[in-house]
C-alpha cells in the first residue's frame, strides 16, 4: 500500500467507496489522517466497518476545516451539489491520483509516466509497462487501469509508475509531475461533463501544466486539438508523433493505424526513460494486447472473430474497421452521439453491419445507404447471423461505437459475452 506521513493530523472527506475510493481510505488511515467517508451503497460502507472511519455523507456535514474532499472520477463535478459545497468552503476537490502525487516525496525515488487521450490510452499504458518490465525495469501500472495505484506496493528506487489518466482523473489532480506525459489524441467524448469540447481539451492539457522543467511531453499530432497543445509548449520539451508508414508486421498484437500511434507513443516514452532500442523492439514483439481491445477471440472455418468492445465511440471504431479487408461489423448499444461519420472513410471495408441495442434502428437508418444492414437487436443474434454469412478470410468484428449499459453492466461484460458466444459456435 502507498501512503504518506504528510497526511498525519489532516482531515479528509471521501465520497464514493468503489475501487479508488476505498483505496484512498485505506491509504489515508495508516498515514494518520482523520477520515469521514460515504457511499450510498451500504455494502461498501460495511466493508470498511471497524477500520477507524467515520461514516457521514459530505453533503450533510460542514466541510469547513477539512483539508480535502476526495471523490471518485465518476462524480460529475459540473453538476454534483457536493462540489459546490466544497468550493464554498474553500476545500480542494481531489482524487486518488493527487494523493499519490502527494505521497511521492516519501517514497523511493521513481519516475512517473502519465498517459491520456480519448482513445488508445489503456493499450499504450499497458504497452509501456510491458516494455519496461521486459527490459528489467521495475514498473507498476495503475490509474484508470488495473489496481488503484494507492492499493499497490511502492516501487524500489529506479522504478517507473505508468498511469492511465482519464480527463476526470486529471481534473482531480493538482501536483502530478510526470517525467513523461503522453497525449495520444483528443476527439469529442464525455461532453456531458464539460461545457464544450474546448473545456474537455483543456482538461487533457492540464497534464502538461503540472510538469516541471526538464520533463518531456509526447504528443500525437493527428488531430487539431492535440496539435494545438503541442504548439503551446516549449518545443524542446515536446516529442511529436504521427502514425504514418510504420512497419507493424513484427508486432502481432499491434495491428491497425490506431496501434501504430500507440506503438510510437510507447517507443518515444521508453526512449526518454533510457530503454535500449533492442529492448523496445523485443517488448513490442512480445506484447499480447489487452482484453476487449482488438482482441482476437477465435477462428471458425477461416473466419476470425475480434472483440473490440472497448471501442465506445465512432472515433475508436474507425481504425478497427481499417485493420481488416472484409468486415462483418457488429455495432450499437447506448449511443453517445447521433452519427457514425468518423467511421465513414472505412465503410468500404464492411461487408455487412449488424445493429444491436438501443441504437439498433437509428444506426440501421444511418448505415443502410452505404452497406447491407441487419437489425439484430441482441449480441447473440448478431454473432449467430454473422457467423452464418461470413466466408473464409472475413472478420466478424464487435466494435460497437456505443456505451454498453443498455444491455450489459459494462464493456467488459459485453466483450466477455461476445467471447462466450464465439466459443459456443459449432
Region spans (language model):
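Short internal beta-strands
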Residues: 33-40, 217-221, 330-331, 348-359
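Nucleotide phosphate-binding/pyrophosphate-handling subdomain across enzymes
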Residues: 2-12, 21-31, 250-350, 365
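Residues at the starts of beta-strands that form the adenosine-phosphate
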Residues: 11, 33-34, 138, 159, ...
Amino acid at each position: 500500500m502507498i501512503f504518506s506521513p504528510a497526511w498525519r493530523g489532516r482531515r479528509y472527506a471521501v465520497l464514493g467507496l468503489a475501487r479508488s475510493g476505498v483505496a484512498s481510505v485505506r491509504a489515508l488511515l495508516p498515514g494518520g489522517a482523520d477520515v469521514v467517508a460515504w457511499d450510498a451503497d451500504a455494502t461498501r460502507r460495511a466493508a470498511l466497518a471497524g477500520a477507524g472511519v467515520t461514516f457521514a455523507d459530505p453533503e450533510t456535514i460542514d466541510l469547513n476545516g477539512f483539508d480535502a474532499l476526495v471523490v471518485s472520477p465518476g462524480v460529475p463535478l459540473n453538476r454534483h451539489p457536493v462540489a459546490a459545497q466544497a468550493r464554498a468552503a474553500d476545500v480542494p476537490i481531489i482524487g486518488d491520483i493527487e494523493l499519490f502525487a502527494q505521497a511521492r516525496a516519501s517514497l523511493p525515488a521513481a519516475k512517473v509516466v502519465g498517459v491520456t487521450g480519448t482513445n488508445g490510452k489503456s493499450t499504450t499504458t499497458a504497452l509501456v509497462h510491458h516494455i519496461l518490465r521486459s527490459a528489467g525495469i521495475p514498473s507498476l501500472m495503475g490509474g484508470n487501469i488495473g489496481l488503484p495505484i494507492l492499493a499497490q506496493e511502492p516501487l524500489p528506487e529506479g522504478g517507473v509508475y505508468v498511469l492511465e489518466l482519464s480527463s476526470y482523473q486529471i481534473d482531480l489532480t493538482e501536483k502530478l509531475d510526470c517525467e513523461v506525459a503522453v497525449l495520444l489524441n483528443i476527439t469529442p467524448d464525455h461532453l456531458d461533463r464539460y461545457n464544450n469540447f474546448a473545456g474537455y481539451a483543456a482538461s487533457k492539457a492540464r497534464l502538461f501544466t503540472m510538469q516541471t522543467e526538464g520533463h518531456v511531453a509526447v504528443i500525437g499530432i493527428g488531430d487539431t486539438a492535440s496539435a494545438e497543445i503541442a504548439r503551446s509548449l516549449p518545443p524542446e520539451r515536446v516529442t511529436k508523433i504521427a502514425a504514418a508508414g510504420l512497419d507493424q508486421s513484427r508486432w502481432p498484437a499491434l495491428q491497425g493505424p490506431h496501434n501504430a500511434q500507440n506503438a510510437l507513443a510507447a517507443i518515444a516514452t521508453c526512449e526518454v526513460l533510457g530503454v535500449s532500442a533492442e529492448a523496445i523492439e523485443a517488448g513490442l514483439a512480445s506484447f499480447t494486447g489487452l482484453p476487449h481491445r482488438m482482441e482476437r477471440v477465435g477462428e471458425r472455418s477461416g473466419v476470425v472473430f475480434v472483440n473490440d468492445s472497448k471501442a465506445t465511440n465512432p472515433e475508436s471504431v474507425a481504425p478497427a474497421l481499417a485493420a481488416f479487408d472484409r468486415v462483418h461489423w457488429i455495432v450499437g448499444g447506448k449511443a453517445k452521439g447521433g452519427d457514425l461519420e468518423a467511421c465513414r472513410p472505412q465503410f468500404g471495408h464492411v461487408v455487412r453491419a449488424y445493429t444491436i441495442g438501443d441504437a439498433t434502428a437509428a444506426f440501421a437508418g444511418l448505415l443502410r445507404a452505404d452497406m447491407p444492414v441487419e437489425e439484430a437487436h441482441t449480441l447473440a443474434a448478431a454473432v449467430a447471423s454473422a457467423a452464418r454469412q461470413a466466408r473464409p478470410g472475413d472478420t466478424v468484428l464487435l466494435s460497437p461505437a456505443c456505451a454498453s449499459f443498455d444491455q450489459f453492466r459494462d464493456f467488459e461484460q459485453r466483450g466477455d459475452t461476445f467471447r462466450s458466444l464465439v466459443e459456443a459456435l459449432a
